[in-house]
Each structure stands twice: as C-alpha cells, then as structure tokens.
Amino acid sequence: MDAPRASAAKPPTGRKMKARAPPPPGKAATLHVHSDQKPPHDGALGSQQNLVRMKEALRASTMDVTVVLPSGLEKRSVLNGSHAMMDLLVELCLQNHLNPSHHALEIRSSETQQPLSFKPNTLIGTLNVHTVFLKEKVPEEKVKPGPPKVPEKSVRLVVNYLRTQKAVVRVSPEVPLQNILPVICAKCEVSPEHVVLLRDNIAGEELELSKSLNELGIKELYAWDNRRETFRKSSLGNDETDKEKKKFLGFFKVNKRSNSKGCLTTPNSPSMHSRSLTLGPSLSLGSISGVSVKSEMKKRRAPPPPGSGPPVQDKASEKVSLGSQIDLQKKKRRAPAPPPPQPPPPSPLIPNRTEDKEENRKSTMVSLPLGSGSHCSPDGAPQVLSEAEETVSVGSCFASEDTTEDSGVMSSPSDIVSLDSQQDSMKYKDKWATDQEDCSDQDLAGTPDLGPQKSPLWEKNGSENSHLRTEKAVTASNDEEDLLIAGEFRKTLAELDEDLEEMEDSYETDTSSLTSSIHGASNHCPQDAMIPHGDTDAIPVTFIGEVSDDPVDSGLFSNRNNNAGSFDSEGVASRRDSLAPLQAEHSQPHEKAREEVPALHPASHDVGKGIRVALSNISKDGNLMETAPRVTSFASNLHTDNLNAKVKDKVYGCADGERTQATERVNSQPVNEKDSNDKNAALAPTSWHQRGQNPGKSYRLKHGLTTYKIIPPKSEMRCYDRDVSLSTGAIKIDELGNLVSPHATGIRIISLSSSVPEAESQPIGKVREFWRCNSVEKHLGRPSESSARGPPSTPVPTQTQNPESRLQADPKPISPQQKSAHHEGRNPLGEGRNQPPTMGMGHVRVPAAHTTEVTFLKPQRRTSSQYVASAIAKRIGAPKVHADVVRPHGYAEKGYAGKAPVLAAPPVTVKDDRTSSPHSETQGWKDGAQWPCVTPPNNHGEDLAVGAPPRGEVIGPHRKLSTQDRPAAIHRSSCFSLVQSSQRDRVSVGQSCGFSGKQSTSSQEASSASEPRRAPDGTDPPPPHTSDTQACSRELVNGSVRAPGHGEPSHPPGGSGTESHILLEREEKPSVFSTDGNETDSIWPPSIFGPKKKFKPVVQRPVPKDTSLHSALMEAIHSAGGKDRLRKTAEHTGEGRPAKLSYTEAEGERSALLAAIRGHSGTCSLRKVASSASEELQSFRDAALSAQGSESPLLEDLGLLSPPAIPPPPPPPSQALSAPRTASRFSTGTLSNTADARQALMDAIRSGTGAARLRKVPLLV
C-alpha cells in the first residue's frame, strides 16, 4: 500500500515514471484503508470458496425445462442445475439418438423469450433457463476466394490545353479515345462538345477518337477548346505586346502609332521619285540582353529578290550596322511626313495579331531624309531631320565597332539588320502586300539601302549649299523635343562608358574585301558643339578593305553603314573646288602641312575638311603620302575644341581614330578625276543596294562610338591572335605548351618604320600578300594615340614620316591591313593642342631579287590593334638612357620640350647584300625602363631600300610625344606586349615593337615571344641581330630587354627553324649590346621563313662554393670523409682574422681509432706508437726512400701540400667506399705496383694531412 505511494512521492529523476501496477485479482478496484474487506490474499481464497459453495447449492437444485427437439417435438425434462451446457447437449443427443456434433443448444429466457448467450462450461443453474432448443447445425459453406483480380493496365496521359496548361490523367491505353474523353474533359474542366483532341498544338493533327492510345502511339495530346481558344488567340497578341512595351519600349518613351507615322523618303529605285515608307522597330528586343521576345506565331515572308542595281554598286553592296537601329529605338522621333498608305485589313481569323506587330513596329519611327537642308545651326539646335540622321549614323558606328569582338564569322546583312530585325520580322506578315511593302521589304530588310541617312556633318559633304539630292524631306517642327531626346541619349552614353572601354577594343577589319565605301562619321558631340551652319567641308571618311582594281568614284561611295549618302556630281565638283587652297601644300614638309590645314579654316572646325584634302590629293595629285596627316590633324583639332566631358572625350577619341582611318582609306583609292565626275553624275541617284547583294559579316551593336566603319563584303579567313585573350584573366598556352602570362599581351608598341628616300615600285599584289600574311593582331586596349605616331614597321610597304620620302614614293593603293593599321582611336588632345598627324603611307620598294612570293600562307587580316602600341610609344616620353649606352642610329623621338635630335643611322649590311636604314626610336615607359622591342618577321624575305646609300642617313620627322597632351583616361593600358604567333600565322611582331623603322628579315619564332625566360646565371644569350635588329639592339639601355610583366623572353636556339629577335633588357646589367652592332655574322641564307641565325653559346660561370669552416666540416661529414677532410687553419689568416681549429683531437686513442675506422679514412689518422715493428718499418721506409730518390720528393711534396683554400668536392660514393681516402687523394692511379702503393701509404701516414696531429710517445721496452 505504502510502496506505490512512496514511489509516487519520489521526485522526478528525468525519466517518465512507470504507471502503477494494476490491483491484484479478486480485489476491489478502489482501495480504502478503513474498508471492512479482507486483505487481498484472503479475498482470493474466499472467492474460490464461494464458487464451490455455489456449485454445491446448484447440485442440490433441479430445474424443470422444456426441451424442443429438432423435429419440433417438445419434451419436458427435469435437469440438474450443476450440469454444464455442453454436458446438457451431449445428454440430450444421447437420449434422442442425435449426433452432438451436428446439433447445438439454444436457450431462451423465460421473461424475454430471447436467446441467451452462454459458454460451453456455463452451469445451467446459473442461467434463467425456461426452454432449451436442440437444433441441428446448418453447415456453413466456406466462401472460396476467387482468382486474384488482375489490375487494369493504365498509363499517365499528359493533356495540354489552353495553350499553356497541362493536366495528367491515368487512363487505359487500350480503350478508344472517345471512352476517355469524358475523363479528359472533367480534368481540364472543359465541355466535351467543344473539345478536339490534337496530336500537338503546332501541327494541329486531329486524332481519331475510335483509336486507342496504343494504336496512336502517343502519351501526350492537346485538348483544343475551339470555343475558348479562338477567342484567346485573337486577344493574345495585345496582352503580350502591351507587356513588352511597358517592360522595354516604355524606357524609350515610344510614341503611339497615331502620332508617330514616321516616313523615310528614300528612293526605292534608280528613279528620282521619293517614296515614303514606315520604319519598323529598328532593333529587335531579342538582341538586347535581358529582354526576351516571344516570336511564337510571328513569321514573315521572305523579302522579294533584290532589284538590279548598277554594277559598281553590286561590287560594293551596302550593309547596315545594328547600331543604326539601337539609336533609332533610343530616340523618339515624329516625322510629319505624309502617312504611308494603310495596309489592307487583316484576316478576321487573327484580327489583332498584325496590329500588335505593327504596335511593336511603330516604336521607333524615324524620319530619315535624303534631301538637303539638314544643317546644324550655329546656336547648337539642329533641325529635326538632321538629328534623325545623326541618330542613324551614330548608331551604325556602334555595331561596326563591336561586332567582330568574338564572332569568327559574319552572317549576311539579312541576319544582321533589317530595320525590322529578325526577331521582330514576323510582325510584318500581313504588310507586304501593298505597294509600300515592296519598298519596306527592300529598304527595311536590307537597310544598306538607306542611303543618305546622314548626320548634319555628312549632309554638308555634298556641296557648299549642302545640296546632295533633289529630294527634300519635310522637316519636323518639334525641335525642342529633339533636343531633349538628344540630351537623354547623351546621358545613356555616359552610363555606358565602362561598357565602351571594354567593347570598343575588339574591332577587326576584313583583309580581302573589295569596297569603295565611305563612312559618314556623324558628329556625336553635344548640340552646342555642332558645326556652324555655313561650313561646307566634308567629314573624313574611313575605308576598310582592299582597293578595287578599277577606278572608283571618290565622290560616290557606297553606303555601307546606313549613314553615308551618295554624292551627286555637283557636290563633288563643289568639293573639289573647295580643295584648291589645300592642294598647293602637297610639297610642304609634314609639320607645315599639319599646322596649315587648320589655319586655312580658322572659323570652321568641321572635321570634313580632311575629306576634301584627301579627295583632292587623290584626284589631282595621286599622292598617297600627303593627305592623311592633314586630315588627321584637322580632325584632332576639331575635337580639341569640342571636348567638354569625359564621355565626350571617349566618344570623340573613337571618332577621331576612325576619321584617321577614313582618311587613309581615301588616300588609298586610285581615283581618276574624270571617272569620278562621270560616275558620280551617273550613279548618285542609284546608290542603294539590296540586302541580298551583301555577303558581309554580322555585327553586333556597340555603345558610345561616333564613327563608322565600312564593313568589307566578305572575308577570306578570320584569324585571331592566339596571344591575345578576350578575357583579362584567361590562361593562355602557346603552341609549345608554354604558359603565357595573360598580362603580357595587352597593348602593343608599334614599331615605327622609316623609309629610304628613293622608293622603287612594289607591286600591289605583294603588298597585299604581305599584309594578309603578316597581321592577325587584335587590339585589346582603348585606342590610345593615333597611329599618326608613325606607320607600322612592315618590311614591304614602308611608311615614311619624311615629307620628302612621302613625296617621292609612287602613289600605290594600300591594302586594307596597312590602312587599318592607322585605325588608331585618336583621343582628343587638350585644348589648343595639335595632335600629331597620321603619317601618309609610302611604299618603299624592294627589288624582286630579294622578295619571296609566299603563296601558301594563310591570308589574315590586319587590325588596328597593331597600331595601339605605336600611339602609346609616342606619348610615353623619352626613355631614361644610361650614360654608357651608344645610340648610333635613327632619330630619337622629341622630348616634351619639342627637341628633335636627329641621329644618322648607318644601314647595316646583311649577308645577302640587303641594306636597310632602320631608325630606331626607343620608347620610354612610365618608369623610365626600356620595354620590349620585337622585330617583325618578314615572311617574304623582302628588305628595305636596297638602293639606299650604304651609310646614308634618313632624317626622321619631328614628332612630338604627347604624353601630357592626352587625357588621363587614355593611360589605362600600361604594358607593352610581345606578340606570340605560330610560324604559320606570321604575326607581324614589328607592329608591336617600339622601335621605328626596324625592317626584319627574320621570321617570328614559333616559341611564344611573350614567354619570359631567364638565362640561368643571369647572363642572357646575345640575341641574333639582322640588319634591322641591330638598330634596335643599340638602342637598348642595358643590353637586354625586359619582357612585359616579369621576365626576359629569350628564345632558345633552334626554335622550329624560325626565330624571333627579342632583345632582352635588364636594368641591373651593364650594356651588353650597346656598343656592338655587328652581330649579324652568323646569318644563314634566307628561307621562306626568313633568314636564320645561330645563337651564341651562353658561357656560365660555376657557382662559387662556400669556403667557410662550417661548410667544409659539414661537407666532410656528409661525404664520410673523416678527419682527413678536416683541415686546420692557421692562427692568423692573411686578412688578420683569427681562425679556429676545425678539428678537435679525440680524447683517447680508442676513440680516434674507432672514428677513423668508422669514417673509412684509412690509416691517415692512426697514431704512431713506439714499438720494434715501427722501428723496422721506419728502416724499411728509409731504404725505400733512398732507392726511389726521384719519386720520394714528389710524394713528399704531395704530402706536404698546404690544405686547399676551397674544400674539394666530395668524392663519388664508389671511390669513397672502394679506395682508402689517402689513396684517392694521392691519385692511386699513378702508382704502378703494390710496393709503390705501400710506400705512398706510409708516406701519407708519416707526412700526410694527419702528420701535424701525430705525437710522440715514450718507447716501451
């Protein structure tokens, strides 16, 4: 009793306590302390006794019961109350001859007459029994389980409905579709009357309802609700397009269609009638990152075949850049030109889809006039149409600048741009039927045809009164809105500055294209910087690509970037008239020409003056050498006045760079004046081409640039500089598997070439071949300084900077790589400064004997990246040269003070009698250190100016280094890079060399030029020098170059039979090559890969060994030399420093002996003890010494030699183990027999190294 209470009273121990045990049987459920009941053990006993008493009482009692037999016979019987029910059954069956197993008893109560439940052992007396029924048992038939039910096979059927929703139902694949159609309808919540089961929603194949899923072989179908989806289709377009306009086009504040019926009055055919057409969205939303366009049901028909155009225009078919479209989309334009004819009503089945397409299409309606009258007024507010044109032309520069960044191939202009672009092109599905749609299909799809969508500057190209064509477009009246939009666009440009710096570096030009196109570089300047109204000058134009073989009209240039219009004949005539004052200066020196061109037009800062200079020089004088500097300097002057902000600096820098390129392109055109006038008059009205004629490459849009590039129609091969990575941190591995530093190939220093005064005729084919083989470089940095710093150091078409040389050179068309060499982004200089002009291109001819026609080299393009380094080199500043450096060659660049020391360069004569007059110009780096000079490979074996006098001088032009002139933004790329290329690629490393005029006759070594290799002992192998590399080597400050970054690239000899001459420079070494310029003695005969030279062997000094006592001791210990290797130093050395004993005597004889034995040092360290044997040994030794008089002194000398100052190197292990130390020391090989060996051993014992430590002991008798 108390135990459960005690356990319950215990505090919890953290575990749940067990429940109480149930009370013992026979005890009441509730326990009361004061109850009168007995204890539990007594209660159990009492209950059993009560049961016994009850049985005895029942035995004594009898019961009168009525028994009903199975036959229905009732029978009265008296039963004993103590009988169990089972016993009663057995007795009754026995009495009635029945089987007890087949019968059962049923007892009914006397009061209720209901059957009573009982157990077989229940006593009859305990039951209130009145009647007992003896019934026969009914045999219960067991329900046998049937065969197992096989589950019905079912599959999951995917039901697509309402175009975008899905449901999954499990149905039988064996039943017909009409049986499962109710299940599908219930799942999709559609009415079966309107549902049509289709195989898919694209093909629309209707399924037969009588077939099952297995017969059709499908597990997915489309339930088309023809009632709901017809309505949904018609309303789908509006919702989606409205969302897209809110999401993307709302940023540009696109006008509604009602008030932006823009018209483009461009002629569709050679006829003079202008036709208005509506421009669609100029840029598909899909081409903007982050905006996805659903072009699900939008398809367009193919454009009609291109119309036949003039043959000249077929040759230079035009192409529009994506940039012209992004600007159209960014600028909201309303052009009040007459609205275009309305399209026919769309089909009733899809009523709203076409309108939606047109809603998207209407977003950037821009009026692009062809006629004149689009001037930029002096107050800076341009007329409306002018700005529209500026928008187009500026935009077109974006794409052409960027498009070749990563793509190796360019698609046709149909892939690139139609004013309704590829993703949005489906919007015009129902618009092509009308007459206007023919025009839009030609001009929108192939928008190269949009000719004079010109900037205000470009329109003034035509003539004095800005008359380009007879058509005039209606000008809009909302000038204020245009100004506002232009301001917003400049803001957008400001935000894109960072993108500009990264994206503008990847422009590449085609090498083998045939083009006579000219870019109207629209002035992307703020309105206040626009050109005054009265300016009649044209803008510099950019030609990229090869010159056509037949004369092309310089006035009539095909519009390749959708921004340059055709010139009519009177425009050309007036332009030529305006050129008259400039042509008188052709023979003037370079500096004079550069400064007089701006002086002629002091009031007008129009960049266009350069184009007139270029055109006049071509048509009148045919002089290719003259005009580029003037145009470039004038363009730079224009922009020095116009710069107001950093964004403008960047934009104009790009613009100037490409104007420079444009000018050179114009210079390269061999134009006949008469042909110009004739063709101009004939072709001016028809300078529109269809898209199909232009197989050019695709260009992606780029932001922030303001000049245009003519895209050559096709490219033979697209080659990349394997050394230059598009990602800054990429790991680059050259052909030999060497890791190339990713920072070593950024901006290159251009090797500036000078030309010999007499220039011989060089076929243009060789020029093209050389450039095609020689350049694959791509510029990665921002176009830093103009290529005006100097032409590339190319062996064949040498460009000179001397006016005399330029005038003497015959005008030859220059192949596109050379021209693109001058495509340096010219960043504007400070206010009031003149930028150094771009040098004209002269051809210094090489005799045919020295030229090798290499016809198997891969044609490759030359890009502007090869001239980036030239610009940097010019602005870096004068190098810091050590006093011992000899600078015998070339001209040095002008310092900041404008001084121009002119040095005579003795041309170096090479083995093959070729003479070159290199003018080396060392380029200083920011820290004053010399940077790498890589001499270019000359794949053709062509060399410079054989006709030059052997010791002739060529005086370089006076150039200003404008490091402080340039904005700080230009200095962001600060490393020169060596160009790595395989032998096959023929990279012109000369473009990357910072020394002007070095003409290389060697080929680029296959090993990466930018891989730093340091000679083992700090000694660089002298680099081989050809005639051109000697000039470079003498310019070196310390005789070896420092590769960009942290290594000296030195090329091991025998690199694939080709060599790249990389002059190593190190600050810590004295000038190794500074005084010696005659290192071309080992030049091998030239091959197609250029002359080969042997490297001089590198002489290495052995590393001086450490002679300290500790090192000697440790060496002896490690080599098991024992005590004979240890030496005792004098008390006072020659320097007066006290020296410690390097050996401490062992304490006892035993320890010394054991140490000697363990150290394998032989008997040299054993002590001499007095004994008869020792005396006998001494006598033997004396006799032997007297007999060998001549040998003994020698051995004595050997034994008595003083210890060496430097411990000898440890002996080989075999020698140390096989021979005693003494024998090895005294050269046992010289002893002939064992007697000599024994004598030598005894001598060593007595007078060897251990003789000093031997001590006398008293004689033991």
Curated annotation (Swiss-Prot):
Compartment(s) of residence: Cell membrane; Cytoplasm, Cytoskeleton; Cell projection, Ruffle; Cytoplasm
Topology within the bilayer: Peripheral membrane protein
Keyword tags: Actin-binding, Cell membrane, Cell projection, Cytoplasm, Cytoskeleton, Membrane, Phosphoprotein, Repeat
InterPro entries: COBL-like, Cordon-bleu_ubiquitin_domain, WH2_dom
Polar residues bias: start-end ranges: 260-273, 409-425, 509-520, 687-696, 796-805, 989-998, 1072-1081
Compositional bias per record (Pro residues), positions renumbered to this chain: 336-349, 1204-1214
KKRRAP 2 (motif): residue ranges: 331-336
Region listing for Disordered, in residue ranges: 1-46, 259-480, 500-534, 580-600, 658-699, 779-843, 907-1104, 1120-1145, 1196-1232
Compositional bias (Basic and acidic residues): 353-362, 587-600, 1121-1138
Modified residues (Phosphoserine): 47, 212, 235, 269, 321, 324, 347, 574, 578, 741, 815, 962, 1192, 1227
Biased composition range(s): Low complexity: 274-294, 999-1010
Sites bearing Phosphothreonine, chain numbering: 447
Gene Ontology annotations for the cellular component aspect, listed alphabetically: actin filament; axon; axonal growth cone; cell cortex; dendrite; dendritic growth cone; membrane; neuronal cell body
GO MF annotation: an example: actin monomer binding
Domain of life: Eukaryota
UniProt motif KKRRAP 1: location: 298-303
GO biological process: actin filament network formation; actin filament polymerization; collateral sprouting in absence of injury; digestive tract development; embryonic axis specification; floor plate development; liver development; neural tube closure
Pfam families with a match to the protein in the record: Cobl, WH2
Function statement: Plays an important role in the reorganization of the actin cytoskeleton. Regulates neuron morphogenesis and increases branching of axons and dendrites. Regulates dendrite branching in Purkinje cells. Binds to and sequesters actin monomers (G actin). Nucleates actin polymerization by assembling three actin monomers in cross-filament orientation and thereby promotes growth of actin filaments at the barbed end. Can also mediate actin depolymerization at barbed ends and severing of actin filaments. Promotes formation of cell ruffles.
Subunit and partners: Identified in a complex composed of ACTA1, COBL, GSN AND TMSB4X. Interacts (via WH2 domains) with actin monomers. Interacts with both PACSIN1 and DBNL. Identified in a complex composed of COBL, PACSIN1 and WASL. Interacts with PACSIN1, PACSIN2 and PACSIN3.
Protein name: Protein cordon-bleu
Lineage: Eukaryota, Metazoa, Chordata, Craniata, Vertebrata
